[in-house]
Curated annotation (Swiss-Prot):
One of its GO terms (biological process) is proteolysis. GO terms for molecular function: manganese ion binding; metalloaminopeptidase activity. This is Probable Xaa-Pro aminopeptidase pepP. Gene3D superfamilies: Creatinase/methionine aminopeptidase superfamily, Creatinase/prolidase N-terminal domain. Belongs to the peptidase M24B family. Mn(2+) 1 binds at D265, E388, E428. SUPFAM superfamilies: Creatinase/aminopeptidase (SSF55920), Creatinase/prolidase N-terminal domain (SSF53092).
Amino acid sequence: MASSTDTILKGKYPAKEHVRKVVEYIKSKEPEAEGVLYLEAQKTIMIEDNDEAAPFRQRRFFYYLTGCDLPDAYFTYDIATDKSTLFIPPIDPESVIWTGLPLSPKEALALYDVDEVLTTDTINAQLALPNQTKVWAIAPQISTHITFLEFPQKDFTLLKEAIEEARVRKSEYEVALMRKANEISKVGHTAVLKAVKHAKNERELEALFIKESIANGAREQAYHSIVASGTAAATLHYMKNSEELDGKLNLLLDAGGEYKCYASDITRTFPINGRFTPESRSIYDIVLSMQSQCISMLKAGVSWDEVHLLAHKVAIEGLLSLGILKGDKEEILKARTSVAFFPHGLGHYLGMDTHDTGGHPNYEDKDRLFRYLRVRGNLPEGSVVTVEPGIYFCRFIIEPYLKDPAHAQYINSDILEKYWEVGGVRIEDNVLITKDGYDNLTTVVKDVEEMEKIINES
């Protein structure tokens, strides 16, 4: 029996609904807004000094208003008539022998949620129709051969802002795409759990995750996977994925497949030999508590700053209980000493991009506790946010705190010495914000006993 997710995804991507959301935002800024929205797909780009095309990644602004993943396409939408038109490349007889017949306008009309499909060789003629008023476009994404001569007014800034804000609140279809991406990524994460005890190298596990992603329908990765063993897990965006596993305690796997342009972003940390050391287990339990308490706060309207603050409070209490921190918990929080162990933001919006639009971060914030928080303000219903607390033992980050009396007074360096080999622990889920609560889209195992059981029975 097909799942509700699969049933939803049998329909068309709701491009027209998205266009109307974007226009609603534009009209909130300019109530009398009229004219034409104009967007371009990503171009076919050739690899430098090569006759092969570079890997294709559709422009997210274009996809949001079309659902079309074809390169070299165009899109217009007439605000007054509510008419959307997709322009796709015409048949190139020279290319058919190599790549087969392209999508026809008739096929495209049946596939995409637009009112009309024409070929790209007609775009300038369509833009030259009389009685035009204003064109809304994105400045860096306009081809040199495109002219807007018939438009007395041009706005190359508001459309991008409008799409970025509209993307925050996900439609039912978008949520289904992200749920599907999470389902596929669960297969990959579980496969890595089953393989880790007998694997020799990080790259084996990265390859396994990618294999399972592709085999189950996620042909692209949402981002470069992080497969960090041992102390490498203290590097937030570790990229090497090539170290031997022998002699390491834990593996941090931050990996998510992308399904039809929509991302998953999942992190799990687990023991390579199938059993956490006491030190690793104690840190894992703190991080799991950080995550569970933060998730329990989530609902429409909650302040993300407050949720992030709670994560630090839970971290401080946990590190105090282990003796890594010492002193008064309120003073430690006020000093921001916990940032030494939890230096990043609690999470970010998720959607077509891993770090999705609309978060309004303030990287100039003088308060280091909030400086790297990628979402500021209150979470709206329909948004999807990652909840990814972590505790890390990174010498490069922590040692300056040990040399600063303002922080050193709160850190027990003797007890800290026992935890360097833990490296880092992060747990990350993708959570939909609902009116009265939340819906966790991520179902990858994170209970310690269950993880260890899977590792040891494989």
